[in-house]
Amino acid sequence: VEPKRYSALLVIFLKDLQPLGGLVKKVLEKKPESFEAYDDQTLKLALRFLPDFVKLLGAKNMISLAFQFLPEMKMLLFGGLPKLILLAEFTGDSEKEVGAKAKEAQEHIREFALRSRVTKNKREVEKYFSIRRQSFKLLHGHAKGLFAAPFVDDVVVKPEHLPEFLPRIRALMVPYQKQKKLIYTIAGHAGDGNFHVIPLMDLSKSSVRAVI
């Protein structure tokens, strides 16, 4: 199957996970090509190491790309970051077509009264996907002495149970992060409830190994 040439994203910012189950169902009614998600830990990494993240994107105009992160920086400074960012991708044969699909989906979820936006161009699409897909590489590059410890299996949870599941998995991980025994991110595919929990740890320390 030949992939469509154009794509646009409906980006949804969730500060409260309670609507997540119904929201996922509603978005899927518009048949997005993909429906991904990442947590606030992932977004914090991109903002914390913004210059290096921009380099990962291979951008020629670094200043221009950095300015694209102003909305996220404002959220961090004034309103706090969302707990989950959802990316619903719509593809088609023209920019006009994909933009219309994404805006139609945005209107379709208006009842949830959530903050959302539709990407305007290819660069914006790449920005959001890169946060999702390059975060582990970014984290690994800055977490000296820490290595991937995939002791948490990928999980598949029905979308309607995600508002209960995600806070519970975070509650398990956060105490160890505060003790500086691990760093973690959560990302995955909201449409089918498949999520990846990626911890980085220094397994040379017995106290850290005991966490596992």
Predicted regions and their residues:
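Noncatalytic alpha-helical scaffold of FAD-dependent oxidoreductases
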Residues: 1-212
